[in-house]
Swiss-Prot record:
Subunit architecture: Heterohexadecamer of 8 large chains and 8 small chains.
Organism: Rhodopseudomonas palustris (strain BisB18)
PROSITE patterns: RUBISCO_LARGE
Protein name as annotated: Ribulose bisphosphate carboxylase large chain
Catalytic activity: 2 (2R)-3-phosphoglycerate + 2 H(+) = D-ribulose 1,5-bisphosphate + CO2 + H2O; D-ribulose 1,5-bisphosphate + O2 = 2-phosphoglycolate + (2R)-3-phosphoglycerate + 2 H(+)
Annotated catalytic residues: 176 (proton acceptor), 294 (proton acceptor)
Cofactor(s) needed for function: Mg(2+)
Length: 485
């Protein structure tokens, strides 16, 4: 269907039920304004449901519509405030699924509020019965809207200056086991990992304040470890102190204590919610603190290809919200992440401007105006033997976190950290010399291991470890002469 079927005049407001596409939510001739927010949905209608009607219903139910005509529409600027589905395309190689492009007037949204944005776009429509499934694939956020957010509190450039580390990825490790250690033993892990050559250590998502280790005890032992490691190495170090708690008051208390102890970074979990994330980001900016976000819980709605919210959308929202770090995938690790899709996530985090790149799952141009860049974090099943692949796939503006790949080292935690640092330095040197480090990677690592026993042990221990599973979320990209130009 390529033409509008909107009913105009007094018939539009007659009491009763009317198809969404006839109420003005399907406007194929509409030209989106520069100030419109545009959402791309993957729509899977129920059998027998017209895909155009299903897409118009998504537009309606995510903006001004309800299930029946209401005369109070006439008390508003209804033509302006209705979301408008202006394009519906079949999804390549996915029968029964359709891409619906929907434009929203900027006045529908509160400035600087992810909670309000998400309440409109995904708040109600995902349970709509005429749909088998619905996924929010991407969004275009106009500069006028982007500028109402503070963006990352610190940003990549200032973080590097604060840490005094340039020209290479930063190295980190999540303390393992994530639960059960006493504060003293937890601090010992932090000290050995940092002294061995890592830049950061990290709490995991579910370490908060439990009977085996109170949060205050953990903070004290961790910062003692950081200070000792800094004194021993002469380098600036940090540990992500997870301030996630049951209330905002408790989170602020923990963040303030971390600041008093001299920490350069705190951590929160995605599950605390968008308003709490923005509140902590504002606190971090006021207090010159780097803010790390663990994407805990995201796969419950980002992983399935036909229903939920794409992680590229979450990455955009979190850059607006103001976090400095976000876990964004590894490509080669144990967690979900198609190479092309992951590249798109990293571009969203790190670029000032994103062109449309369908092969990376990016459907719209995105101008980030003056917002700081967001540092992506790679963690989950990575080890020193993959260093050449990680550098090639992810670049240098990234935190590489080797949890098991540090703490599981056969010679101990400090040796594991040293192995990762030596592997990284060897690869950076090869890159700076102009070598083809991706294809020569194994040779480069083997040569470095001749003078580094910890690296030799790491390469031997994990030489056969790979996670070669097919990704469940890949770009829906079918090259054509027009698309591939």
């Amino acid at each position: 269907m390529n033409e509008s079927v909107t009913i105009r005049g007094k018939d539009r407001y007659k009491s009763g039920v009317m198809e969404y596409k006839k109420m003005g939510y399907w406007e194929p001739d509409y030209e989106p304004k520069d100030t419109d927010i545009i959402a791309l949905f993957r729509v899977t209608p129920q059998d027998g449901v017209d895909p155009t009607e299903a897409s118009a219903a998504v537009a309606g139910e995510s903006s001004t519509a309800t299930w029946t005509v209401v005369w109070t529409d006439r008390l508003t600027a209804a033509e302006k405030y209705r979301a408008k589905c202006y394009r519906v395309d079949p999804v390549p190689n996915s029968p029964g699924q359709f891409f619906a492009y929907i434009a929203y007037d900027l006045d529908l949204f509160e400035n600087g509020s992810i909670a309000n944005l998400s309440a409109s776009i995904i708040g109600n429509v995902f349970g709509f019965k005429p749909l088998k499934a619905l996924r929010l694939e991407d969004m275009r956020l106009p500069v006028a809207y982007v500028k109402t957010f503070q963006g990352p509190a610190t940003g990549i450039v200032v973080e590097r200056e604060r840490m005094d580390k340039f020209g290479r990825p930063l190295l980190g490790a999540t303390v393992k086991p994530k639960l059960g250690l006493s504060g003293r033993n937890y601090g010992r892990v932090v000290y050995e990992a940092l002294k061995g050559g890592l830049d950061f250590t990290k709490d995991d998502e579910n370490i908060n304040s439990q009977p085996f280790m109170h949060w205050r005890e953990r903070f004290l032992y961790c910062m003692e470890a950081v200070n000792k490691a800094q004194a021993a190495s002469g380098e600036i170090k940090g540990t992500y102190l997870n301030v996630t708690a049951g209330t905002m008051e408790e989170m602020y208390e923990r963040a303030e204590f971390a600041k008093q102890l001299g920490s350069v970074i705190i951590m929160i979990d995605l599950v605390i919610g968008y308003t709490a994330i923005q509140s902590m980001a504002k606190w971090a900016r006021r207090n010159d603190m780097i803010l790390h976000l663990h994407r805990a819980g995201h796969s419950t709605y980002t992983r399935q290809r036909n229903h939920g919210v794409s992680f590229r959308v979450i990455a955009k929202w979190m850059r607006l919200a103001g976090v400095d770090h976000i876990h964004a995938g590894t490509v080669v690790g144990k967690l979900e992440g198609d190479p092309a899709t992951t590249k798109g996530y990293y571009d969203i985090c790190r670029e000032d401007y994103n062109p449309m790149q369908l092969e990376h799952g990016i459907f719209f141009e995105q101008n980030w105006a003056s917002l700081n860049k967001l540092m992506p974090v790679a963690s989950g099943g990575i080890h020193a033997g993959q260093m050449h692949q990680l550098l090639d796939h992810l670049g240098e503006d990234v935190v590489l976190q080797f949890g098991g790949g540090t703490i599981g080292h056969p010679m101990g935690i400090q040796a594991g950290a040293t192995a990762n640092r030596v592997a990284l330095e060897a690869m950076i040197m090869a890159r700076n010399e102009g070598r083809d480090y991706l294809h020569e990677g194994e040779e480069i690592l083997a040569k470095a291991a001749l003078t580094c026993t910890p690296l030799k042990a790491a390469l031997e221990t994990w030489k056969n470890v790979t996670f070669n599973y097919e990704s469940t979320d890949m770009p829906d990209y079918a090259p054509t002469p027009s698309v591939s130009m």
